[in-house]
Amino acid sequence: MDKLFKLKENNTSVRTEVVAGITTFMTMAYILAVNPSILSASGMDSNAILMATAIASAIGCFAMAFLANFPFALAPGLGLNAYFAYTVCGSMGYSWKVALFAVFVEGLVFIVLSLTNVREAIFNAIPTTLKKGVSVGIGLFVAFIGLQGANLVVASTSTKVTVVNFRTDFNTVGIGALLAVIGTFIIAILYVKHVKGSILIGIVATWVLGIICQLTGLYKVDAAAGFYSLIPSWRSFDITAISQTFGQCFNLKGLNINILDFIVIMCSFLFVDMFDTLGTLIGVANKAKMLDENGRLPRIKQALLADAIATSAGAILGTSTTTTFVESSSGVAEGGRTGLSSVVTGFLFLIAIIFAPVFTTIPGFATAPALIFVGFLMVSAVVEIDFNDLTESIPAYLCLICMPLMYSISEGIAVGVISYVIVNLVAGKAKKITPLMYVLALLFILKYIFL
């Protein structure tokens, strides 16, 4: 095991990696329930989507582990699945088979870009300070997702977002938000006390408290409002359902496809996936202290190749773009440093096929504390930004603030790259800007104009 994953070289142990892998899985297990609920709007079978999601995630995790030896987990990405279901199959009116084929082609393009070092060059072209900004921005973004998942932050017509009213719908929204607060303090206290597995313990403890609240009547099930039973229940699951989506991305006979539309769809998947993945790798790798003195990530080519392979494999199985998950940061926070962590996460995704009713019972308010706390850990990188150099700090600031407010890692990177080029040009520091940064800035601007 040590020889395969270089545990001693990375100052870790089997126990630490296993705990990290379990923690990562627990924080992203929600995708097993969320992805089918979104993609089923396209007409796909929800059971087939669940199986495709689990298997594609496992393939991605294994590829990341054995090709790159990184503790990064993969699964079908949120945002891209919504674009798949509601834009491509919804407003544009295309069959889900066409959408899957677009994802498959995108994956192939990614494989080519990874093998030809294009994606690696983009990663290395981003300035170190901007990478720090990406890491902080992802921390804020992850924390915001956690606050939303706990219903601590809710929508507001006047201010866009506001704090939850605990008294309104206390037995559903209120109690869940309160338990999330308690869970966050549990993790924080355990972390301060240097307890191993503090994040995982916090998730399980919050879930158990929720079950107790349900049994005592403090938490009430309201499926119509999205508040389900917290008590795991066994129900039959049709494992043959995946036959309804497997290989259907190639079954395009009789389907009308506008070539221009298809190119736009494929490029949209490609663009968002590329910079979401790069942003996640930058942020999580920075937190794990994996970047070298030049801000480069060793074995980045293999990591990007694993991501690309998982995308095409996922399309064949029957799911939208598979990408590196930002929730990997929770496992890194537990000490995960090698591919063994990813292997554990991958196996749990396979096991989840059998025990799907159990894993999909984990409530959002139980995993939210983990995301909120991981956000704190990632935001700590802000002290590494040199605020005395305004040509470096202003783009980093715009990058980190736009990620949570625009609810997108790729948009934050776009703003950061464009502002970096403009600020340094105006400041007379054009020599700092690499040719590839000019190209990226231009591509981002064109994206806002035409896509």
Spans of model-derived segments:
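Transmembrane helix-loop junctions in multipass membrane proteins, especially transporters and channels
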Residues: 40, 65, 69, 73, ...
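Helix-loop-helix junctions within the multi-pass membrane cores of secondary transporters/permeases
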Residues: 2-35, 56, 77-86, 90-138, ...
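Helix-loop-helix hairpins and the membrane-proximal interhelical loops
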Residues: 1-48, 166-167, 203-301, 445-446
